[in-house]
Swiss-Prot record, chain E:
Residues 5-255 form the ABC transporter domain. Its main location: membrane. Disulfide bonds: none annotated. Coiled coil: none annotated. This is Dipeptide transport ATP-binding protein DppD. Part of the ABC transporter Dpp involved in dipeptide transport. Responsible for energy coupling to the transport system. Belongs to the ABC transporter superfamily. The keyword Metal-binding applies. InterPro entries: AAA+_ATPase, ABC_transporter-like_ATP-bd, ABC_transporter-like_CS, Oligopep_ABC_C, P-loop_NTPase. It is an enzyme of class 7 (translocase). It is found in: Cell membrane.
Length: 328, 326, 293, 616, 326
């Protein structure tokens, strides 16, 4: 238990440093969210730009003269209370945006991770057991090639092929607006259908990397003495493959699974923007584009918290499932 | 000034846990001396503290209490430079020659680098000295090995190489931790022989940590001392041949009794002495009594309460036992 | 002696890579691209004059990869663009590996409060998501005219942390190795222990990471061009792709298939070469590394 | 371990399903029960639906004063007094039945059958309140000195003396003036709005008259307006009322991040003619996304810029897709930063005008656009013949693509070509950066072509992309050498004044720092374009005088090249005919010219006049 | 006594990056029922290869080139995998050398027992399983309650070794093969295991084959000893004969180099040189570079496997054509 307390304190320190770093970074970002509005006002009303800017600042509730330190103290203070700040662009609290967007992102990444993990584990173990055979070469070559495709290219291709060319998938959104959200089969079906694109874009590269890691791990575990001992005991291949090889090869991956989910929170910007999917990444991209610093810091903090929680959970899960760690 | 290493009242406690509450006494009040040209064997099973003792002697670990003197100077009180100077005189050979040799360096480099560092030589002299050293420990022809890597050698060859490396600083004492346990039976004698030769021919004091009583006997039957450790304490100490032929402590007896005998007839007829327990005792600061009490077949109530002192039962033979101490 | 050690080096590090199928193919691919970047522009001329009427020509002898939306030869652009792609990618990977190694080794060797502090720094860079951070950095540095080296450094800042973490773990285990202890016993100086004993075993590891970084650096550099941080280079593959996908909409027209295909092919092939090489390197060197643990 | 792993996976599955369910429920901003249960007027059931693409703020607040307003729903929701068709110059009455313009006074007679979508009648009180609201919130338009409501259906606007003559047009056609703040929705704010607006006006008039403004008045105003603004900004009718009562033809009923659903206003005055009772907006996230939506019939109409080949492909993939183009009343230009010494040299700008092949640039960038073949006179190509006399044209330099001419100009001015590179008279190479806003596809394509042509001529030009969200800032701060930007543009009011104002006393001059107040040599003597613009504004009603000034401005613009226009932007409008809706007017119909600056007006007009009908 | 396993001309190799390791090169051996056979050799001499090839459990890079292993008249090497699986463990159980890593680290000990039982279609209830497992664990002097619910890493090296033996005994096999059962164990534990095996042999009707590099262990336990050198069988004789009258020079060297506790230390004589690399084994007799009796023919011709009087088999040119060892 001491270990976890220790670890928690350490992660807390890391968190504070990271968040402060993010804050400094965002606050040094050039650009003024009120600029566009000011240009518009100045042009429409034929007034001096400086004056228009002042009006725009007031309209958006931005105080450009507030010192960075004050802002920082305010921000940290809010964060302590679980308040992620205020979005000037959306004119609402970041918490509300997170409440709207996070479930979708979590939905996509957890489903994508689940799918890619299960298939990747299976394929990796399968390939490793057929090491050197054609099927192994095929699987690992394919996985490597998929890994070589930059994710945004993959996302664009998926969108084009499935939504545009063959019109199999709906374009954009999380569900059709003319449906009432409910637990009905048809609604859940629509939600799943809308999520297929983003899920594929996340899951395919993931799957490739799980496959390759699992293949490597399996190959390593297969060399272990206890595998040969299991063979010597006359255990069936299927039992060895599942209980002995797969379980042991999977352990390190299960830990990285949790961490992976944390990291994916931050990596959704491109995919969600391409698929127009209303998750965290979508808002993140928007926040950068419109220089919504409040939203930006808020989402950044969320992602950092996500990664840290994931790291912590990974430690915990790993200790839970691996007796070698548990007993130490 | 013939004393090279003196260990005075050395204890070692390993602590762990967040508040360092869990602890384990690994060594307790050890006193030892090594003088020029000595042979010393530390025997005992694993977990008895022999490796820790050897590492403390070689200053690879700090004792929790007590003094370690090299050439009469407390190594934890002298300055770094002096310690460095003295360190060359005390060398250590690890148990596992696979791990103690750099896997990606050639044999030439493994010897020549420290040689150049210690002797401040280079060029042809370095080459010649490296060659001499390799030949000295029996890797002949030396040039054949120069561009080989450790994994090209057998276990015995590797251990020789590790010994050769220890010799680069012209040490006055070599401490070797289980130098033969990772080596094939047929090559073990040769390594022990090498240590004996180093001792005989160059006057280097040798401290061997062994669990193999036979090897201990081979090393000390001409001269040298044996120290038997149990539960972090010296239970018996004395001239090698004397102890092996007339063991006083019950543990020493069991140890000798359990050692393999290379004679089928004798082996089949011998009766193994069984202990009451084969567990390794875990001693804490609160532990009382003789560490062997829980396993000893001769224990008395006294053994549970009082730590037996190390008493001399004969010239050059000390034992720490309430029962056999007299 | 020297000749011998060269030979040894060849047999220990080069020859196994040539024997391993994966690393051999990877090496061939990478060599091909490096040649393309170095020698290519000298051989292949670049004519960027647009010719709208000649756009989307199918691959032919005259235009091996066809022409793009502007009617410019795609092959020429790929060849000339490889220079900026490869220089930025390689530099960024190099810096990432350099920073990662130095910090990782330092962390591995330093105990106590300094070590924990370095640990925390590594962790900080691990928990800040790199891509969004880079987006912001891109905006922050937008008005500085950064040169390739500076941009590579900027990219490397977000790549080194995982490597540093791995290296520090490696060093932590290596420094308690018995051969390191032996070097200490032999009074070997710290620099010898760090740069000869420890670094020697990290080299294959670092190399693998270097190759792995190529992928990350490649993606980042393309992203940076999109964002306008890196100096705009119309033949940079990332920009070509941007033109193809977003400006010219080549995906949406049957004529433009080859346009996108050849750009993606080259990007994927380059990264795939790196992946193959690193897989090969891992296969060749890791057993030995593992065997010594 | 096995069982633990299974548990772990089970937890995992549960977590993602709950996440999904959470995501499903409580996602969208939708009216509360109260709104849906309201008794509906008896209406014939209509089933027409049209799908469009646009943008809107999300979470949707329904407050036009809040950030983002109501997005693309604007013209469906807020009707102006009238629509103005630029091509015919005709005003189509909407909320106004008729109006009378007198000296500094506009009297508007409101339509008597206009009702809000919740059944409340639309009266002159709503207009008064709206004007107070805008003035209080936006500190604009102070052109309106006061507004009165003599009866429920008459509004009298008293304009200030300084009000420009084009303001009447704005007043009549601007969607903001009539119905933004219905009294029954904003009832808690009415008095406060009037108080703040009056105070603001008072200060403004004191300032324009050059009189001192008492400090306490200023502070009072600051305090009151801040308080008011904060209150209004926080007000989200769509959320708090659960509905958005609108006077326009459609009312938003359900809004998500990616889609917005609007239902017809049953009480709308044209309701009986409308055959379409539902509008679905898709989020316009990127042009490619809109292309994809058009191909797959996800939307019925949109106006993205699209390369030629994509259009061809689209038409083959979707034969129901039609395209037409209208002038976007704006042009894309090469603009210079006159703070950089390089561009102060007119010779260089002239040479550039000769080097560029503007037809080629147009082909690459927006192929449907109108090309400026010869001139750079600051008047849109499509309007040139209307505003520039033959006589004037004779006087203008023709900038046809002619590199030899360019070379000659440069050589005469002391430039030298050394190797492949042109050098300035001071020995420096002609080198600069061309900045272009990254997210605008057509601009980037144009920039690439410009850079390419200039480089092959022997200049050293590099291109730089301005990241998303940074355009105004970069351009305003003058942190560029040359750039691609809107040049002279008409925007809402199709008169050369708008364009010249932009060039010499507005946005473009703000970013280029073109010395507009300097005097320039013309056949009419030494003239300053800045003065000319002011003069033109004063003489707008006097057509002859205006024409004369316009000739002079055209001359200066063409000869002194504050910007080089590349092509006249057009709005390509794509619509699916016969998939969901049909009845689109012919491509020549002047109604399309209403599209620039608010294409939803066209859709609204087509629906409310019953022209667009659902496909059976 | 009848022959239970007959090995005929067994050849097995390992494929490695550098080439082919000829680990077992023409081994022929008869194992008698209910006897204890020791296979003695240095590390990498091919001794483990023999038993692994016999049971077809070579590591993935191992290949059996030729030979037959007849168990009760059936050739194990050509037997179908399914059939072989049934025989494995139920009739022939092999306890591998690496006892430390031979248990799945993520499974409790009890699950290993369960797996093994299930694999052989034995239908025991859970309580039956516990009972049987406990019985076998008690047989190797382990506390079943504690051990069964432990993870492997909670057990000491000696305990793991005993767990493996208990596991091997679970289905009452006919033949029990142990690979280095005592190496890497402490003296007392080693003696303990040897004692245990002796008792097992008395208690159960079982054929025991074990592999060791310590010929002293063979002396204690074995009825017959087979000596392997460099992948070749060099001598096969009864234990008593081997120790009394070693025929092959290597066997003789091996016995002379033992540092047993009862030995005359002045006669201990290490074998010079290093064991051969099986990648490029020496020509002719593989021992010739280290053999003090080496003749010209030894370099060229491989000695034949000849049977001398009694049970003695040897492969040495000294005995061919009736040349007696002097």
């Amino acid at each position: 238990m001491n270990y976890f307390v220790n670890r928690l304190l350490y992660l807390l320190v890391v968190f504070v440093i990271a968040i402060s770093g993010v804050f400094v970074l965002v606050n040094n970002m050039p650009g003024d969210p009120a600029y566009g509005l000011a240009v518009y006002i100045a042009q429409q009303r034929n007034m001096q730009f400086e004056q228009a800017l002042e009006i725009a600042h007031k309209m958006m509730g931005i105080d450009p003269h507030e010192s960075v330190v004050t802002r920082y103290v305010k921000f940290m203070n809010n964060l302590l209370r679980g308040n992620f700040g205020y979005s000037t662009f959306y004119n609402t609290s970041v918490n509300e945006i997170i409440a709207r967007a996070l479930p979708w992102t979590l939905f996509v990444i957890s489903l994508a991770t689940f799918i890619s993990f299960s298939i990747g584990i299976y394929l990796g173990a399968f390939a490793a057991q057929k090491r050197g055979k054609t099927i192994d070469t095929l699987i690992s070559t394919l996985a490597s090639i998929i890994q070589a495709i930059p994710p945004f290219i993959l996302a664009v291709l998926i969108l084009f092929v499935f939504s545009v060319r063959f019109r199999l998938l709906p374009l954009g959104g999380a569900y059709p607006v003319d449906m009432e959200p409910s637990l009905s089969i048809s609604f859940i079906g629509k939600v799943l259908l809308h999520a297929v694109g983003p899920i594929l874009a996340v899951a395919i590269p993931q799957m490739a990397s799980w496959t390759l890691s699992m293949r490597g791990n399996t190959a390593q575990v297969m060399e272990e003495d206890f595998i040969r001992f299991a063979e010597m005991r006359g255990l069936a291949d299927s039992v060895i493959a599942s209980k002995y090889i797969r379980n042991n090869a999977m352990l390190p991956l299960v830990a990285s699974l949790a961490i992976g989910i944390g990291y994916m929170l931050g990596g959704q910007t491109l995919v969600e923007s391409i698929f127009n999917y209303p998750g965290i990444g979508f808002y993140f991209g928007k926040a950068i584009a419109v220089r919504d610093f409040g939203l930006l810091t808020g989402l950044f903090s969320l992602i950092v918290i996500g990664v840290i929680v994931a790291t912590f959970v990974a430690d915990f899960v790993y200790a839970l499932i691996d007796p070698r760690v548990k007993l130490k | 000034m013939s004393k090279i290493i003196e260990i005075k009242d050395v204890s070692k406690v390993f602590s762990r846990g967040f508040f360092k509450k869990k602890h384990r006494v690994v060594l307790e009040d050890i006193n030892l001396e090594i003088s020029k040209g000595d042979r010393l064997v530390i025997v005992g099973e694993s977990g008895m503290g022999k490796t820790t003792l050897a590492r403390i002697m070689a200053d690879l670990e700090k004792p929790s209490s007590g003094e370690v003197l090299w050439f009469g100077e407390d190594i934890h009180k002298i300055d770094k430079r002096r310690r460095k100077e003295l360190r060359g005189k005390v060398q250590y050979v690890h148990q596992d020659p696979y791990a103690s040799l750099h896997p990606a360096k050639t044999i030439y480099k493994i010897i020549a680098d420290p040689l150049a560092n210690a002797q401040r030589v280079n060029g042809k002299t370095l080459y010649q000295r490296t060659k001499d050293l390799l030949e000295k420990i029996g890797l002949v022809p030396a040039e054949y090995f120069f561009n080989k890597y450790p994994h090209h050698l057998s276990g015995g060859g590797r251990q020789r190489l590790a010994i050769a490396r220890a010799l680069t600083t012209d040490p006055e004492v070599i401490i070797a931790d289980e130098p033969i346990s990772m080596i094939d039976m047929s090559l073990r004698a040769a390594i022990i022989k090498l240590f004996k030769d180093l001792n005989d021919l160059y006057g280097i004091a040798v401290v061997l940590v062994l669990h193999d009583i036979g090897a201990a006997k081979y090393f000390t039957f001409e001269k040298g001392e044996i120290v038997v450790l149990y539960g972090g304490k010296i239970v018996e100490k004395g001239r090698g041949i004397r102890i092996l032929e007339n063991p006083a402590h019950p543990y020493t007896r069991v140890l000798i009794n359990s050692s393999p005998i290379a004679d089928p007839e004798l082996a089949r007829n011998r009766v193994l002495e069984q202990l009451r327990s084969y567990d390794v005792p875990i001693r804490t600061k609160e532990s009382k009594g003789c560490p062997f009490a829980h396993a000893c077949n001769y224990y008395t109530e006294k053994c549970k309460e009082e730590v037996p002192p190390l008493v001399t039962i004969e010239e050059g033979h000390q034992v720490a036992c309430h029962v056999f101490g007299k | 002696m020297r000749k011998e050690s060269l030979k040894n080096f060849y047999y220990d590090y080069i020859q196994p890579l040539l024997v391993n199928k994966k690393s051999l193919i990877g090496l061939i691919i990478l060599t091909f691209f490096i040649l393309m970047a170095t020698v290519g522009p000298l051989i292949v001329p670049l004519d960027m004059t647009s010719n709208f009427a000649e756009r989307y020509q199918k691959p032919s002898l005259k235009h091996p990869f066809g022409t793009d939306y502007f009617g410019v030869d795609i092959f020429q652009q790929i060849v000339h663009g490889s220079r900026s792609v490869i220089s930025l990618t390689m530099l960024a990977s190099f810096f990432a590996v350099l920073i990662g190694t130095v910090i990782g080794v330092a962390r591995g060797y330093l105990e106590g409060i300094v070590g924990r502090a370095i640990d925390a720094i590594i962790m900080v860079f691990l928990v800040i998501p790199s891509f969004p951070a880079l987006l912001i950095l891109a905006a922050v540095f937008m008005n500085y005219n950064l040169n390739v080296v500076e941009i590579a450094l900027l990219v490397a800042v977000w790549l080194w942390a995982p490597l540093a973490k791995q290296i520090s773990a490696q060093v932590l285990s290596l420094k308690s190795k018995e051969f390191v202890e032996a070097s200490k016993m032999l009074n070997m100086p710290l620099r010898y222990i760090l740069f000869s004993d420890i670094a020697k075993l990290l080299i294959p590891y670092i190399f693998i990471n270097f190759v792995m970084q190529i992928k990350g650096a490649m993606e980042f550099s393309v992203g940076l061009m999109f964002l306008g941080l890196a100096k705009f280079d119309p033949t940079h593959w990332g920009i070509m792709l941007n033109y193809a996908l977003y400006q010219a909409g080549a995906l949406y027209t049957a004529k433009g298939f080859h346009y996108i295909f050849f750009i993606i092919l080259n990007i994927v092939l380059l990264i795939y070469g790196g992946i193959l090489l690193s897989q090969g390197v891992e296969e060749v060197f890791n057993p030995r590394l593992r065997g010594n643990e | 371990m096995n069982s633990v792993l299974k548990k772990f996976i089970a937890i995992f599955v549960i977590v993602f399903f709950t996440a999904g369910i959470f995501a499903g429920c409580g996602q969208q901003t939708k009216p509360s029960q109260e709104a849906t249960q309201e008794t509906k007027p008896q209406e014939t059931v209509k089933t027409g639906e049209i799908r469009l693409a646009t943008d809107w703020p999300f979470p949707f607040h329904g407050n036009p004063f809040g950030p983002g307003g109501v997005g693309g729903a604007w013209w469906f929701v807020y009707e102006p007094f009238a629509y103005y068709i630029p091509q015919t110059g005709e005003y189509i009455p909407r909320l106004a039945e008729s109006w009378k313009v007198e000296e500094n006074k506009v009297t508007v007679n409101l339509r008597k059958d206009a009702k809000f979508s919740d059944g409340e009648p639309f009266t002159s009180k709503d207009v008064v309140n709206t004007v107070n609201f805008i003035q209080a919130m936006w500190q604009w338009p102070y052109d309106i000195e006061s507004v009165e409501a003599p009866d429920d259906h008459t509004v009298v606007f008293n304009l200030s003396k300084t009000s420009s003559s084009s303001f009447v047009h704005t007043l009549l056609t601007d969607g903001a003036m009539a119905s933004l703040a219905p009294v029954h929705v904003y009832k808690d704010f009415v008095d406060q709005a009037k108080e703040v607006a009056d105070l603001g006006k008072k200060i403004f008039y004191l300032q324009t008259e050059g009189k001192p403004v008492p400090e306490d008045m200023k502070t009072e105003y600051e305090k009151k307006s801040d308080e008011f603004r904060k209150k209004v900004n926080d007000f989200a009718p769509f959320k708090t009322l659960g509905k958005l009562p609108v006077v326009g033809s459609f009312e938003p009923v359900k809004v998500t991040q990616s889609e917005m659903e609007m239902k017809a206003n049953k009480y709308h005055w044209a309701s009986s003619q409308m055959k379409i009772d539902r509008v679905i907006f898709k989020k316009w996230s990127s042009n490619e996304f809109v292309w994809a939506s058009l191909i797959s019939n996800e939307i019925d109409a949109a106006h993205p810029s699209m390369p030629k080949d994509v259009v061809e492909q689209l038409s083959t993939l979707n034969p129901k897709l039609h395209v037409l183009t209208v002038s976007d009343l704006s042009d894309i230009s090469l603009v210079f930063n006159f703070k950089k010494p390089l561009f102060k040299d007119l010779n260089l700008r002239k040479a550039i005008a000769h080097i560029l092949d503007r037809n080629k640039i147009r082909d690459v960038s927006v192929w449907q656009a109108n090309s400026y073949e010869n001139y750079a006179d600051g008047i849109l190509k499509s309007m040139e013949s209307k505003w520039i006399t033959q006589d004037t044209l004779q006087k203008l330099t023709k900038y046809n693509t002619d590199t030899a001419a360019a070379e000659e100009i440069l050589k005469n001015a002391g430039y030298k070509k050394v190797g492949d590179t042109w050098q300035q008279p001071n020995g420096q190479p002609v080198a600069f950066t061309l900045s272009v806003y990254g997210p605008h596809n057509d601009w980037v394509l144009a920039a690439r072509e410009v850079v390419q042509e200039l480089n092959s001529f022997g200049f050293k030009v590099e291109m730089k992309l301005i990241p998303e969200g940074m355009r105004d800032q970069v351009m305003r701060s003058g942190d560029y050498d040359a750039a691609i930007e809107f040049g002279s543009a008409w925007w809402g009011y199709p008169h050369p004044l708008t364009g010249y104002q932009r060039l010499y006393d507005g946005d473009v001059s703000a970013i280029t720092s073109f010395p507009a107040k300097d005097k320039y040599n013309t056949p009419w003597g030494e003239l300053s374009p800045y003065d000319l613009v002011l003069e033109l504004q004063k003489n707008l009603q006097d057509e002859n005088k205006a024409m004369e000034i316009i000739q002079q401005l055209a001359y200066i613009t063409n000869e002194y090249l504050p910007v080089i226009p590349l092509y006249e932007k057009v709005l390509p409008i794509y619509y699916n005919d016969g998939y969901r809706v049909t009845g689109w007017p012919s491509k020549e119909d002047p109604i399309w010219s209403l599209a620039p600056g608010g294409i939803e007006r066209v859709y609204d007009l087509l629906i409310t006049t019953g022209k667009l009908v659902p496909v059976k | 006594m009848s022959i239970i396993i007959r090995v005929e001309d067994l050849r097995a190799v390992y494929l490695v990056r550098e080439g082919t390791i000829k680990a077992a090169d023409g081994i022929s051996l008869d194992i008698l029922e209910n006897s204890v056979t020791a296979i003695v050799g240095e590390s990498a001499s091919g001794k483990s290869t023999i038993i692994e090839a016999m049971t077809k459990t070579l590591p993935p890079n191992g290949r059996i080139l030729s030979g037959r292993v007849l168990y009760k008249g059936k050739d194990l090497l050509t037997m179908r995998e399914e059939e072989l699986r049934k025989i494995r463990w139920k009739e022939i159980a092999l306890v591998p050398q690496a006892a430390q890593q031979s248990l799945n680290p993520t499974m409790k000990v009890i699950e290993h027992f369960k797996d093994t039982v299930e694999a052989h279609g034995v239908r025991w209830s859970h309580s039956e399983l516990i009972e049987k497992a406990s019985e076998k664990l008690r047989m190797v002097r382990l506390n079943p309650e504690a051990v069964l619910n432990s993870y492997p890493l909670q057990l000491s090296g000696g305990m793991k070794q005993r767990v493996l033996i208990a596991l091997a005994l679970l289905l009452d096999p006919v033949v029990l093969i142990l690979d280095e059962p005592t190496s890497a164990l402490d003296v007392l534990t080693q003696a303990h295991i040897i004692q245990l095996l002796k008792e097992l042999k008395k208690m159960l009707k079982i054929t025991l084959i074990f592999v060791t590099h310590d010929i002293a262990v063979a002396a204690e336990l074995a009825d017959k000893v087979a000596v392997i050198y460099g992948g070749n069988l060099v001598e096969y004789n009864s234990t008593f004969q081997i120790f009394k009258n070693p025929l092959h020079p290597y066997t003789r060297g091996l016995i002379n180099s033992i540092m047993a506790v009862n030995a005359d230390m002045s006669k201990v004589k290490p074998i010079p040189g290093d064991p051969p690399s099986l990648l490029n084994p020496p020509s002719g007799c593989r021992f010739h570079p280290r053999c003090e009796y080496a003749m010209e023919i030894c370099k060229k011709e491989k000695p034949k496997w000849i049977r001398l009087d009694g049970e003695a088999h040897v492969a040495c040119h000294l005995y061919e054509e009736g040349r007696p060892l002097k």
